[in-house]
Amino acid sequence: MKAAIFDKFGSAQEVLKIQNIEDPKINDNEVIVKLSKSGVNPSDVKKRAGAFSNLLDNGFVIPHSDGAGIIVDVGNEVSRDRIGERVWIYQAQYERNYGTAAELISIDSSRAIKLPDNTSLETGACLGIPAMTAHRCIFADGSVKGKNILVTGGAGRVGYYAIQWGKLFGARVISTASNDHDKQACLDIGADGVVNHREEDWELSALDENNGEKYDRLVDVEFGVNLEHTLNIMKTGSTIATYSSTQNPNPELPFLKMMYMDLTLRLVIVYAMPEKAKNDAIKDINNKLSSNDLSHRVAKSYDLNDIAKGHEIIESNSIRGCVLINID
């Protein structure tokens, strides 16, 4: 089969290669999926660049955790009725070397989720990390019905789904965005208000947008940079759920202030989510796909031969929405 691989760390153009490699073998609890689309996420780019020094200890890596395709074979413990299913895949390149940037993948059957008939393979490849991370951020600390939620970076991959999860389940959601185009994208999916986080003291605008009431929940894309702003507008007993702190990866925490707020700080990464949380997310994702209640954005698509461009555009931080690699 044809696959993108890397066997050393470095820039996308330098280390990503297209090669013909052996087709995957199948274990009893696995399925083999003929992939149509592979989703590129920031975590994939960081892995390729060398964020995890032991990643290549067992040989080359086929990148990417998210994807979509059609099941073409099943292991002995999987019903043959699954052959022919259109599926979305998550957590493919986690604690293993082989991800979705290939023509075929063997993967635990529980990680290949049947797509509703009304949902395209393109949409399926967008779901794993962004939609599941957003779901965990919104729901990990209980019902959001009637709650006030602030989502920073609402036009981003995770933030876009976080706004939708909050609104679909009865919350008031205010978002931040850095330009008029992103602001409109947030409003189009239901945000009750949007403020510009590039402005000085933007948290005051966020408070005004919520009629002066502080927030119950925060879903935050840049924890370290935003903390000095966001703490001022969070309620006592509130929760901050954050999935990234790229600009300030080692933030200092005002411990006493946070303690006296009875603040819950939740760090979210999809790989570490409890299985129940993953299953809850999958159930809600498929239900809302079936009812056409989730919106998705594909920003760019590239052929497998141009996979390096997909990594580079993620690194440039110049686009919003999903980046896909076309396999078929």
Model-based region annotation:
Residues 80, 90-153:
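NAD(P)H dinucleotide-binding glycine-rich loop of Rossmann-like/cofactor-binding domains
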Residues 86, 148, 172, 238-239, ...:
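Short glycine-centered segments of the SAM/dcSAM-binding site in methyltransferase folds
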Residues 100-101, 178-185, 250-255:
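Short, glycine/polar-rich helix-capping loops at beta-to-alpha or helix-loop-helix junctions
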Residues 125-199:
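Mid-domain Rossmann-like dinucleotide-binding core that forms the NAD(H)/NADP(H) cofactor-binding site
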Residues 201-213:
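Short amphipathic alpha-helix with an adjacent loop that forms part of the alpha/beta core around
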Residues 225-294, 326-328:
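Glycine-rich phosphate-binding loop and adjacent beta-alpha segment
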